[in-house]
Amino acid sequence: MGMRMMFTVFLLVVLATTVVSFPSERASDGRDDTAKDEGSDMDKLVEKKECCNPACGRHYSCGR
């Protein structure tokens, strides 16, 4: 195989991997329900003005 063909195969593999790992908007099969629950928990803490997560901790107290 030539270098150009190997590079083309590499790009196709990268593209296929990206498309497969890209999250879809279809109905969930339950694999990411925990992640959704954790996000809602963080929203509840932000409503209380308490957040120990570094993403929101600089704006709110930790509450510990």
From Swiss-Prot:
Q: Where in the cell is it found?
A: Secreted
Question: What post-translational events are described?
Answer: Not hydroxylated; hydroxylation, on a synthetic hydroxylated GI, improves its folding but impairs its activity against target receptors.
Pfam families associated with the record? Toxin_8
Q: Name the domain of life.
A: Eukaryota
- Feature type site, description Key residue that binds to three hydrophobic amino acids of the delta subunit of muscle-type acetylcholine receptor: 60
* Entry function: Alpha-conotoxins act on postsynaptic membranes, they bind to the nicotinic acetylcholine receptors (nAChR) and thus inhibit them. Reversibly inhibits mammalian muscle nAChR (IC(50)=339 nM on adult subtype (alpha-1-beta-1-gamma-delta/CHRNA1-CHRNB1-CHRNG-CHRND) and IC(50)=5.86-995 nM on fetal subtype (alpha-1-beta-1-delta-epsilon/CHRNA1-CHRNB1-CHRND-CHRNE)). The higher affinity site is the alpha/delta site on mouse muscle-derived BC3H-1 receptor, and the other site (alpha/gamma site) on nicotinic receptors from Torpedo californica electric organ.
Q: Which family does it belong to?
A: Belongs to the conotoxin A superfamily.
Q: What is this protein called?
A: Alpha-conotoxin GI
Please report the organism this UniProt entry assigns to the protein.
Answer: Conus geographus
